[in-house]
UniProtKB/Swiss-Prot annotation:
Binding site for Mg(2+): S46, T68
GO CC terms of this entry: cytosol
Function: Necessary for normal cell division and for the maintenance of normal septation.
Residue stretches in coiled coil: none
Organism (species): Bartonella quintana (strain Toulouse) (Rochalimaea quintana)
Molecular function GO labels: GTP binding; metal ion binding
Biological process according to GO: division septum assembly
Name of the molecule in the record: Probable GTP-binding protein EngB
Names of the cofactor(s): Mg(2+)
Domain EngB-type G residues, every copy: 31-215
One Pfam family in the UniProt entry: MMR_HSR1
Binding-site positions, GTP: 39-46, 66-70, 93-96, 160-163, 194-196
CDD domains noted in UniProt: YihA_EngB (cd01876)
Length: 215
C-alpha cells in the first residue's frame, strides 16, 4: 500500500483556491505532488476541474478566451500548508494557450510562465493536456506536446466535450490521436475521454490522477 492509497475519497472533500501565480517568481515552495491541466483557451479546463471535485464554481469559467492568465492552485480544505500539515495533492489550472487575438505581450508572458513551470517543477507529477474532441490536436497542442517531451514531463491526453461529438467521429479521433502519440515519448499511452457536462469519464480521470501521484 502506498502513502496515497487512502486518497480515493479526496475528490469528495471540499477544495479551495489558495493562490494565483502571475510569474514564476511567485511559485509556492515545492511540497505536495502537483497535477496540472493544460489546454487551448476554452477547451474546458475550468469546467473539468469543477466536475472533478464536484464543485460548481471552484475554478472560474468564462466565455472569454484567455481569461485565465495565471497558474491557479487548488487544494483540499483542512490543511494549514505548514510543514507536517501539507495537503496531499494540489491541482494547477494553467493559462490557456492558442488565443490568437490576445496582445502579443500577454501571449509571450503566458508562454514564459507555462514553459518555466513545466521545466523546473520537480513536484509536478503529470500534466493533463486537454483536447477538444470536436477538433483534435492542433498545431498549438503539438507544440506543447513537443515541449513536454523535451522537458521529460509525463503527460496524458484528455479529450473533452465528448458528448458533443458523434460516436463514430469520436472513435476515429481516438485512433488518430493514439497514432500521433506514438511519436511523443513522454506521453502516457492511455487516452481519457470526458464530458464535464454529462459527468463522463470523471472516475477514470480521478483514478489516473491517484495513480500518477503514487509513482
Amino acid at each position: 500500500m502506498t502513502k496515497y492509497s487512502s486518497l480515493s475519497g479526496i475528490f469528495s472533500r471540499k477544495w479551495i483556491f489558495i493562490r494565483g501565480i502571475p510569474t514564476i517568481h511567485f511559485l509556492p515552495p515545492e511540497g505536495p505532488p502537483e497535477i496540472a491541466f493544460a489546454g487551448r483557451s476554452n477547451v474546458g479546463k475550468s469546467s473539468l476541474i469543477n466536475a472533478l471535485v464536484q464543485q460548481k464554481s471552484l475554478a472560474r469559467t468564462s466565455n472569454t478566451p484567455g481569461r485565465t492568465q495565471e497558474l491557479n492552485y487548488f487544494v483540499p480544505d483542512g490543511f494549514s500548508g505548514e510543514p507536517g500539515n501539507l495537503p496531499p495533492i494540489a491541482l494547477v489550472d494553467m493559462p490557456g494557450y492558442g488565443f490568437a487575438e490576445a496582445p502579443k505581450n500577454l501571449v509571450d508572458a503566458w508562454t514564459h510562465l507555462i514553459f518555466s513551470y513545466l521545466r523546473g517543477r520537480t513536484t509536478l507529477k503529470r500534466v493533463y493536456v486537454l483536447i477538444d474532441s470536436r477538433h483534435g490536436i492542433k498545431k498549438n497542442d503539438g507544440d506543447v506536446l513537443d515541449l513536454l517531451d523535451k522537458a521529460a514531463v509525463s503527460y496524458q491526453i484528455v479529450l473533452t466535450k465528448s458528448d458533443k461529438t458523434k460516436s463514430n467521429e469520436l472513435a476515429k479521433l481516438i485512433m488518430i490521436t493514439k497514432t500521433k502519440l506514438l511519436k511523443h515519448p513522454a506521453a502516457y499511452p492511455e487516452l481519457l475521454v470526458t464530458s464535464s457536462e454529462k459527468a463522463l469519464g470523471l472516475e477514470e480521470l480521478r483514478a489516473a490522477i491517484l495513480q500518477a501521484i503514487a509513482v
